[in-house]
């Protein structure tokens, strides 16, 4: 059948993570906002973010924070993007606090800033070891109460509706296989990364880069699509499924990495790609598929309080991280590249925006600095929302009628999308592809 019935709204946001939710909440109340999300609203990678969220504590830290971000990114970052993110950090963190987000405090009631790999100073706010969950759940609860925001779970974007490089909406499919169209003045892509395409990833398996595949199909510009972060420390397990992250904040609190002989072999607080390479070198040296992590600076009670989820996950596998050597191994974690945007989330297609891990404005360069992901999502989602809110230009609805019967079945579509993305990565960086992408999900 052809698309004669459709939903019409002001803004459609694809994704219910931090970027999508914060963008929705930053839009004015007179904008009707429709959020669709691929699975249940709580099944997004933002919920999994453990370590924390960076903030510029004071102006004296600006130069150091800027340099730490640039150095971690191998100086391939866009400096303007980095400046905007850092300069906007205090504002968005204050907004989160006003919305009810709780960050941990020390015994004096002051915010407890921690430090992670490649940070020279403590500048990371956290909520135990579930900072992403605290932020995302708070934003989600507020969004559900807003009359102008509607959230539709278990609905997948399968195409853009566009003509002459102007986006008019999206085609989507619900959990029952029913297809439909959403026509909107503005569209924000916030679908996360591509972890679901890998055999070993910290991401949810349904995070499969749909926005990237559709961008390729429709000629929307991508940037640094081969810049994919492998996190050095995920809990080693023979079980299939998503890999459990052992947050970098554990190493920030004194955890050390050991090889098969029980020897330290690297500076644990180097950038993620450096630590990952050091681990891979040790695994090859000993012919193993893991190394070990242990946290000698805390006792059991302290670790259980500071890192409750990590502590429990290790205990379920039979390890007390404060006493035992816990096996860890690298796994795909984050996408630095993505749909190319400017500093306001605008893509190369009119009225199509991208935010969060889906977007790439160059802020992370070749390797993301720990705990910059939540901050980046918040800062640039707000900037995209601000542009949409202040855009009073006329937009003509002009698009070809959508033939819903022309779309392939779900399994065939997923294979097509995966091939589009992997071929693009292979073309950009065959060495990375051969090393990591040949081991796919």
Residue ranges and their predicted role:
Residues 54-85:
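Glycine-rich active-site loop/strand segments that organize a redox cofactor
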Residues 186-240, 244, 374, 378:
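Glycine-rich loop(s) and the adjacent beta-strand/alpha-helix scaffold that form part
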Residues 41, 214, 220-320, 387:
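An anion/pyrophosphate-binding glycine-rich loop and adjacent beta-alpha core
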Residues 1-2, 7-9, 18, 26, ...:
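Glycine- and aromatic-enriched mobile tails/lids
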Residues 79-90, 123-141, 152, 202-209, ...:
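Short beta-strand to alpha-helix junction loop
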Residues 32-37, 224:
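Short beta-strand "acidic-cap" motif of Rossmann-like dinucleotide-binding folds
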Residues 152-153, 158-167, 172-173, 306-360, ...:
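A glycine-rich dinucleotide-binding beta-alpha-beta segment and adjacent secondary-structure elements
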Residues 98-178, 190, 234-237, 257:
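Conserved redox-cofactor binding core of oxidoreductases
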